[in-house]
Structure formats: structure tokens, C-alpha cells
Amino acid sequence: MDFGALPPEINSGRMYCGPGSGPMLAAAAAWDGVAVELGLAATGYASVIAELTGAPWVGAASLSMVAAATPYVAWLSQAAARAEQAGMQAAAAAAAYEAAFVMTVPPPVITANRVLVMTLIATNFFGQNSAAIAVAEAQYAEMWAQDAVAMYGYAAASASASRLIPFAAPPKTTNSAGVVAQVAAVAAMPGLLQRLSSAASVSWSNPNDWWLVRLLGSITPTERTTIVRLLGQSYFATGMAQFFASIAQQLTFGPGGTTAGSGGAWYPTPQFAGLGASRAVSASLARANKIGALSVPPSWVKTTALTESPVAHAVSANPTVGSSHGPHGLLRGLPLGSRITRRSGAFAHRYGFRHSVVARPPSAG
């Protein structure tokens, strides 16, 4: 634009009627804030990547992450530099406006000059105001030139401040093929839902035939893991219980596996029912009985009558069997012959007697 062709009223009016340098200063502050944020983000990304790839995370996944994140970190750093430059340019534009504003003639001064010239011309009846009119016109020409110079300088400075390096687009850190795969998956959903609904509508002959299908379908993966863990714990607990029970049996019952206590058998079975039913064991000193020259326990002859005749103490030819219902001695007493002797009168076994043998007659063949 040719600012020299415009009168000072227009140039000065444009400079004074606008909002001033306030918006440009606000823009400069905003760009500075953006630059700081981008710089912090780039520094944070670089620090985290260096910390992860330093020791804890290595391998193909780490290399893939670094390859995808490094260009983005570089873009953040570049964007921070561009934002800082934009802030500086906005501040430069505000400074150029301030300089042009100072150089521009205020509109009231121009208006006063124009009023003075018109007044001098109106009252110049005899030419007495010609010199004053020339001076006022010269001042107006200076205002014109001053505004033109200010506007030309402001246009050049603002044009230089408005030259910004465009921001580059951020690099792609994702796979564009994923969008195609997602579209294909979404397109396949109606058919999948239709197949699921048709499978759910299948009629079963017996409702109890598909209880397992409903049960498994209602169990979530987390619940399945919990069920498997509980089953494992129950089997483990059962094995441990059997192990400790076998140890307790060996310690309590002995190698045979069964031992009767004071109250009877540990297991209520017929073969152990009589265990522990005898009287408590007792012992005495110098109280043994005599059978001939043999010392025997008192229980051996406890049931033998002491008033029997000497013949009754002989060993009977038909020994009696001790009753199992009698007192529980060690050998259940000795067989007695006195009772048999009483039934047979004075008969008794005689030892050392020589029997007479009758020979077989020849007539017997």
C-alpha cells in the first residue's frame, strides 16, 4: 500500500482507532507458554525413555517403543522452538506498532491545523493572512510526510515479524492398517451377532441337557481362575490331611495300626469289641501259690476249691475246658478232675499200675 498517497488524517486515524499493541502482547505471552509446555513435555518424554531403556526394559518391544517415540520427542522439541519463535515474532510486531504509534501525528493536531487554515482563509480579505496560511500548510505537509514515514516503517517491521516458520505435522506413531482391520471387524459384527442369536435359539429336547453350557457361559475368566485355584487347594489339603493322619496313626496305634484304649477299641468293629474289657493289671510280691514244687500265680488256682481231696488234685483223664465267661486270668485256671471224681464215686487215675492184657484167642481168627 502507498501510504504516501494517503493524507495524514487517514494514516493517523488508522493508528489511533485500533486496539493497539495489547492483542499482540497477549499473543506473545500465549506462545511463550506453549513453548514452555512443549519443552517440558519433550524433556519428560526423553527422560522416561532413557530411564526405561537404561536397564529395566530391554528387548524387541523396547526397541520398537524407542523407534516410535523418538521421532515424536524430536517433533515436540521442534514445536517448542517454533512456538518460542512465534512468541518472539509477536513481541516484535507489538514493538513495531509502538514505534509507529509514537511517530504518527495525533489526529487532534491534524484537525487543529485544518481548522486554523480554514479560519485564516475565511478572514483573508486583504491578503493579510497569506503568510500564516502558508506556514499552516507547511506544517500540514510535514504531518503528511511524518505519517507516511511511520506507516512505511510499521509495514516493513510488521511484515518481518509476521514471517513465521510453519509447524510440521506430528509423526505417525500408529499403524494405519489398524483402521482397516477395525473397519473389517465392525463390518463382521452383524453376521457374528446373527450366528450367536441363531445358536441361542436352538431348541433342546431336554432342558437339563444344556445346563453345563449355560453354567460355563455365565462364568467369567476371573471366576474360572478362582475355581481352579480352590480345587487345587482342596486337593492339596486332602493330601496333607491323609499324610498327617497316617503319621498320627503310626504314633498313636503303633505299626499294627490298632490299639485298644482304656475304654475299649478305637474302631467299633466286632473283632476289636472285646479289647480293653479285662480288669486292670495287678501285681503282688511273695504271694504265689504252690502246685507241688511249682510256684504259680494266684489266678491259676483261684477257682479251685481248697477242700478237695488229694485224689482230686490228680490230673483228670478228661480235662475240662475253661469257660470263656469266667474270670479273666492269664491261663483261665487249671482243669479240675474233682467234679468228675464225684460223679464216678471213688474212681481215680492211678499211675504206675500194671495192666493185665488178655491175648486174642485163636478162634477169633
Swiss-Prot record:
Gene this chain is encoded by: PPE25
PANTHER family (UniProt xref): GLUTAMINE-RICH PROTEIN 2 (PTHR46766:SF1)
Name of the protein: Uncharacterized PPE family protein PPE25
GO process terms (BP): phosphate ion transmembrane transport; response to host immune response
Cysteines engaged in disulfide bonds, as pairs: none
Effect of disrupting the coding gene: Mutants with simultaneous deletion of PPE25/PE18/PPE26/PPE27/PE19 genes have a slight growth defect at 100 mM phosphate in defined media, and at 30 mM phosphate, growth is severely impaired. Knockdown of PE32 or PPE65 in PPE25/PE18/PPE26/PPE27/PE19 deletion mutants result in a severely impaired growth in phosphate-limiting media.
UniProt record similarity statement: Belongs to the mycobacterial PPE family.
